[in-house]
Amino acid sequence: MLKTIRKHGITLALFAAGSTGLTAVINQMTKSTIHEQALQQQHALFDQVLPPDRYNNNLQESCYLVDAPALGKGTHRVFIARKDDKPVAAIIEATAPDGYSGAIQLIVGADFNGTILGTRVTEHHETPGLGDKIERRLSDWITHFSGKTISGENDTHWAVKKDGGDFDQFTGATITPRAVVNAVKRAGLYAESLPAQLPHLTACGE
């Protein structure tokens, strides 16, 4: 009887150990898959704001952390695009703190001469049917920044039409597009200062 119990106990212990090991392997594989999918989604998003033919480095591995009031409160990531090792542009995470329903998160592709290469909203809580037209899937409004140049802090073109600028506001919703226009402008101006900052920036993960 004792031998039988001992045998069953050993069998259960081995089964438990095997199950634990299998679970660990599956979890690791799942984490790797999720991480790979996240990188692919990020790469696809980057392609929307920075033409791939402008750079030839691994953009996702050229990540830096910055604390800049121009980009909003807290730490934001900046990805530096290089062509043959020369910095040529950046993808900048930015926050518009003054959306109608809270902060709006963006990524902005820009060169170092004040030209916006692309913009996408990555997170927001704006009103459905009104402010949510900042999403690319709902409207092409966000694409109108591409190719626009900022001549300086006082560039009056960088405002919604209601404020005398060049960008459309939405019917019944001016606060949301105004917040995005201003955030993109600030990010574009910040991009001009990046080349001088590069030697002093902290790499992501450090």
From Swiss-Prot:
One of the record's GO molecular function terms: FMN binding
Superkingdom per UniProt: Bacteria
Residue(s) carrying FMN phosphoryl threonine: 174
Pfam families: FMN_bind (PF04205)
GO biological process, one term: electron transport chain
Segments passing through the bilayer: 9-29
EC number assigned by the record: 7.-.-.-
Cellular compartment(s): Cell inner membrane
Any GO CC annotation of this UniProt entry: plasma membrane
Membrane topology listed for this record: Single-pass membrane protein
UniProt xrefs under InterPro entries: FMN-bd (IPR007329), Ion_transpt_RnfG/RsxG (IPR010209)
Cofactors that this protein relies on: FMN
Assigned keywords, A-Z: Cell inner membrane, Cell membrane, Electron transport, Flavoprotein, FMN, Membrane, Phosphoprotein, Translocase, Transmembrane, Transmembrane helix, Transport
Keyword Protein transport: no
Protein purpose: Part of a membrane-bound complex that couples electron transfer with translocation of ions across the membrane. Required to maintain the reduced state of SoxR.
Similarity comment text for this entry: Belongs to the RnfG family.
HAMAP family cross-referenced by the UniProt entry: RsxG_RnfG
Subunit and partners: The complex is composed of six subunits: RsxA, RsxB, RsxC, RsxD, RsxE and RsxG.
Identification of the protein by name: Ion-translocating oxidoreductase complex subunit G
Organism: Salmonella typhi
Gene name tied to this protein: rsxG
